[in-house]
Amino acid sequence: YLLRERKIDIKHFVLQTYTYSFENHHCFADGLDDVCSRVTHLKNTVFDFRRFLSDFSAILYDLFIWHLYFQNADPVLFSQFEFDAYISLSNSKAFPLVYDNGARALDELRMRVERKIKYLGRKYPHADLAIVREKYRELGLKPDNVYFFIRGHNLYDLISIVCKEVCKAMLRTAKKNKVVTHDMVSELYRRRNNLDYELRQNIKYGAYFPIRKLEQDIREFLGEN
C-alpha cells in the first residue's frame, strides 16, 4: 500500500488492503484480548496488547522510515529481507516474550534498531527523511501504527507467538488463583489449538483507518455509495 503499486485499486477490480497485507488486519491490537478470551474462556488481565503494539511500532518507526527511503532510492542498500529481521522478537522459557508486557524483548529490539539507525545516519548523512515522514504520514503512517505496514506474514507469526504465550499465562494465573479446576485447565490447554482460527477471525470493522478505507471501497464496488 505505502509503495503505491499501480493498478491495485477498485478501478482495476483489485481491493487495496491499505496495510501491507490482510494478515496485518488480523493483528489489530484492540481485538487481541477477545482472541485470547475466546481460546481460554477467561478474561485477559495479564497483557496489554495495545501498549505492546504501540511500543513495538514506535521502536520500529524511524528504522521503517529509513527502509522506505531506500525502497525509493536503492532497495539493495536496505532490503525488505534485512528490515524483516527486525520484526522478530526473542522468546525463551527463561525469558518469555510476554514477561513485563514484552519489556525485555522490546528493549533488545530497541538496542538493535538504534545501532542500525546510527549506522545509517553516519553512512548517509544527506538523506532527507523529513520528506519521507511527511509523504507517508499523509498515507496514514504514524509512530504508533507501524505494525499495519510491515510485512504481514512476519507480523502474524509474531502475534501468534505472543497470543499463545498470553493464553498460557492466563491459564497459569487462573490455576494459581483457583479460578478453574485442574480438569478445566487441562481442557483449556487442549483448546489452545484453536488460536490460529480465532486470530483469523480478528476483524474489527469500522474500528480503524485502513479497515474503514477497505469497507468504503467494497461499498463503492457494490454500488452502495
Region roles according to the model:
Residues 1-225:
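Acidic, divalent-metal-binding catalytic cores of TOPRIM
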